[in-house]
């Protein structure tokens, strides 16, 4: 029940913020022309959750990539789980996704960082999670641990950017390339 309330509040926050947006935001997940060539023919792991949708219709990135015949080996689930069904602080368990049959590995339980054994059958990790920019959210630390594990195990990692839903632009650093 608490997860549902949190999801409703989060959704209202996103809707409220989107009314202030000055234009159409194109997320990293929607830029398939940029990243599909980097993952085709590779074994892909994903760090995604219920915010990892593509387009205006709520189609999950996992489903989108499976339709593109991308070899998704496993999904690493952050706090609240892959489908967003776990309450805040609740341990997320390993398992299989009931919709796709893809293996789900928890990064919010006994281990916060993928192990070498969990990464051995993966060539590249895609990270696509909408963060709200609040310090108490664990998604940014999940990204840090996954980056660390990829570096330690010589795995590629692609972060699909999801800009702040309130249309904030950081003026401290700008990059001329979407790959920087």
Where do the protein language model's features map onto the residues?
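A short helix->loop->beta-strand "cap" motif at the edges of active sites that frequently abuts
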Residues: 70, 153-156
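N-terminal phosphate-binding or glycine-rich loops at protein starts, especially the Walker A/P-loop
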Residues: 24-68
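Bacterial Sec-dependent N-terminal signal peptides
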Residues: 1-24
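Glycine/threonine-rich flexible loop motifs
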Residues: 131-141
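Short internal beta-strands
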Residues: 73-79
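Conserved small/polar residues in nucleotide/adenosyl-binding loops
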Residues: 173-180
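Glycine-rich oxoanion-binding loops at beta->alpha junctions
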Residues: 93-121
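N-terminal beta-loop-helix "entrance" segment that forms/cooperates
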Residues: 80-98
């Amino acid at each position: 029940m608490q997860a549902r309330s949190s999801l409703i509040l989060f959704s209202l926050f996103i809707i409220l913020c989107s009314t202030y947006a000055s234009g159409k935001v194109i997320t990293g997940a929607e830029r398939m022309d940029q990243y599909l060539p980097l993952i085709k023919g590779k074994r892909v792991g994903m760090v995604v959750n219920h915010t990892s949708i593509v387009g205006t219709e709520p189609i999950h990135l996992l489903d989108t990539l499976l339709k593109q015949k991308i070899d998704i080996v496993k999904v690493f689930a952050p706090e609240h789980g892959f489908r967003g069904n776990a309450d805040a602080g609740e341990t997320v368990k390993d398992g299989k996704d009931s919709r796709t049959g893809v293996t789900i590995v928890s990064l919010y339980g006994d281990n916060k960082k993928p192990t070498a054994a969990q990464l051995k059958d993966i060539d590249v990790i895609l990270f696509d999670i909408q963060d709200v920019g609040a310090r108490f959210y664990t998604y940014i630390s999940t990204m840090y641990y996954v980056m660390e594990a990829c570096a330690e195990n010589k795995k590629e990692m692609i972060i699909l950017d999801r800009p702040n839903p309130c249309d904030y632009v950081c003026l401290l650093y700008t990059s001329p390339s979407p790959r920087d």
